[in-house]
Design a protein with these regions (language model features):
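Active-site environment of divalent metal-dependent phosphoester hydrolases
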Residues: 54-57, 93-94, 148-153, 173-175, ...
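Non-catalytic positions within long, well-ordered alpha-helices that form the structural scaffold/packing
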Residues: 40, 136, 185-186
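An N-terminally biased module of ancient metal coordination in phosphate/nucleic-acid-related enzymes
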Residues: 1-82
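Extended substrate/RNA-proximal surfaces in nucleic-acid metabolism proteins
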Residues: 59-161, 166
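Mid-to-C-terminal alpha-helical segments outside catalytic/metal-binding sites
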Residues: 3, 207-216
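Short loop-to-alpha-helix "cap/lid" segments that border enzyme active sites
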Residues: 175-185
């Protein structure tokens, strides 16, 4: 069934690398505090921490242990006015990972949404097969990370197949291809925006531009 709700919650940053030392997104608690302060200034109330998870390199229990330790350290050092922190993961697709036990433990917070990263080369048949096998699982819902980075033809196919998309806010600040992304948003295919912040980068400067474009 085709989505019709095109409204995006800009108080939620769905994709952010803010856990200190958990991946290359933040090198310290101080960096993470600055990241979250910038999020708060952009009127973001909830940040979903989505450190990279590579199934071919690490087990799910090992990853979750590292993530929890990093999140605990950060929470102990946050001020009361900091955005709420949710835990998730940016999971790199691997051939056959639909058979991996424990995938729901990588979903965002208490939801069944799994943020899935695809390869940046042309997807071979085996990856397509894995993607569709993941979509058929009843215990998770796939959300495709930074969909603007992949082949438009592949994304259009996934839109027809009703796979939910996440866009990085930065892509809406550039005129090139913006019309395409706004069309995806208007037709309800884009479920979330994310900063995909690594270190301090450009912070959340794109967030206000997105807010104006989407008339929030």
């Amino acid at each position: 069934m085709k989505r019709t709700n095109s409204k995006i919650d800009l108080t939620l940053d769905y994709h952010a690398h803010v856990l200190p030392g958990c991946d290359h997104g933040s090198d310290s608690v101080e960096t993470s505090r600055k990241q979250l302060a910038m999020a708060a200034a952009a009127r973001v109330r909830t940040v979903c921490a989505t450190p990279h998870f590579y199934p071919h390199r690490e087990s799910i229990p090992s990853f979750l242990q590292r993530r929890e330790a990093s999140a605990r350290l950060l929470r102990e050092n946050l001020t009361a006015d900091a955005p709420q922190l949710q835990l998730g993961a940016e999971v790199l697709i691997c051939d056959g990972m639909e058979r991996l036990d424990g995938l729901p433990r990588l979903c965002r917070g208490e939801t069944n949404e799994l943020l899935l990263e695809m390869p940046f080369y042309q997807w071979p048949e085996a990856i397509w097969d894995t993607l569709y096998a993941l979509c058929e699982r009843r215990d998770i819902e796939i959300v495709l990370a930074h969909a603007e980075r992949y082949s438009p033809e592949a994304i259009e196919q996934l839109i027809r197949d009703n796979v939910a998309l996440q866009l990085n806010s930065e892509c809406l600040t550039r005129p090139l291809h913006r019309k395409r992304y706004l069309t995806w948003i208007k037709n309800g295919s884009v479920k979330y925006l994310g900063s995909d912040i690594h270190m301090l980068g450009n912070g959340y400067r794109a967030w206000e531009i997105c807010r104006n474009l989407l008339r929030e």
